[in-house]
């Protein structure tokens, strides 16, 4: 991590980094202009593939109470296939944070990372699924277990981009993501609470608000990643946003 391309990430891990929730959300709002349609189409593509594959799993399993080993294997394959597409949604946000154009078919760009992403997805699923059963086992309400589950989900938000952008192994990406979260957990939690409120408004608008809420969520995550880690996998030469520069001010945006 002593290479120049890791300088921002190294600084964030050693000295911390600054996040202004209002400034980040404001910049994200600016950056979704001109990108809402491809982001929505990409999201629909991922959801569509997930629904088709899971319907296939339900069809094969039938009404059996216990899934056969063949069905379990198919479920594992589905998780492996979906991991690069899920990671692609994160990378679309990173692209917009770097002032790059995005494409709906970008969801198919990261299958070369399928092995580390699939392994990471399974580990992350295990980590985020521990708390509710644990709370039930000690007689607590499942709502109590939802709080650490949400925090763990937020803490792992850097994981997929670290694998694709930095070339980290699954364990390196997970531990690094947790360390980054510990540096700015209050700001990260606050930002996600604001995004939850945005999604609540989207639901109350009979779904129309998702046209803005989904791109805002993805681009916000991309900006946070840029601020904490820098962006190495994209050519930043012609971009006005330098990933190793100080965070943009509230009054200046490149979108």
Q: How would you label these PLM feature ranges?
A:
Residues 1-255:
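Hydrophobic alpha-helical membrane segments
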């Amino acid at each position: 991590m002593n290479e120049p391309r890791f300088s921002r990430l190294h600084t964030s891990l050693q000295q911390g980094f600054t996040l202004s929730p209002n400034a980040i959300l404001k910049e994200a709002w600016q950056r979704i202009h001109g990108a809402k349609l491809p982001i929505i189409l990409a999201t629909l593509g991922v959801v569509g593939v997930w629904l088709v594959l899971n319907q296939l799993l339900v069809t094969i399993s039938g009404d059996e109470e216990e899934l056969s080993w063949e069905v379990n294997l198919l479920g594992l394959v589905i998780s492996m296939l979906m991991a690069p597409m899920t990671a692609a949604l994160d990378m679309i946000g990173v692209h917009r944070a770097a002032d790059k154009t995005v494409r709906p078919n970008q969801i198919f760009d990261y299958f070369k990372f399928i092995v580390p992403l699939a392994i990471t997805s399974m580990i992350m699923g295990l980590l985020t699924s521990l708390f509710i059963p644990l709370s039930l086992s000690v007689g607590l309400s499942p709502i109590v277990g939802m709080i650490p589950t949400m925090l763990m989900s937020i803490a792992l938000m850097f994981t997929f981009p670290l694998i694709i952008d930095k070339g980290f192994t699954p364990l390196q990406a997970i531990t690094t993501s947790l360390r980054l979260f510990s540096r700015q957990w209050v700001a990260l939690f606050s930002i996600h609470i604001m995004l939850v409120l945005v999604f609540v408004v989207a639901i109350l608008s009979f779904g129309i608000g998702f046209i803005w809420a989904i791109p805002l969520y993805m681009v916000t995550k991309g900006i946070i990643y840029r601020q904490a880690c820098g962006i190495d996998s994209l050519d930043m030469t012609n971009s006005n946003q330098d990933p190793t520069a100080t965070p943009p001010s509230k009054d200046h945006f490149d979108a």
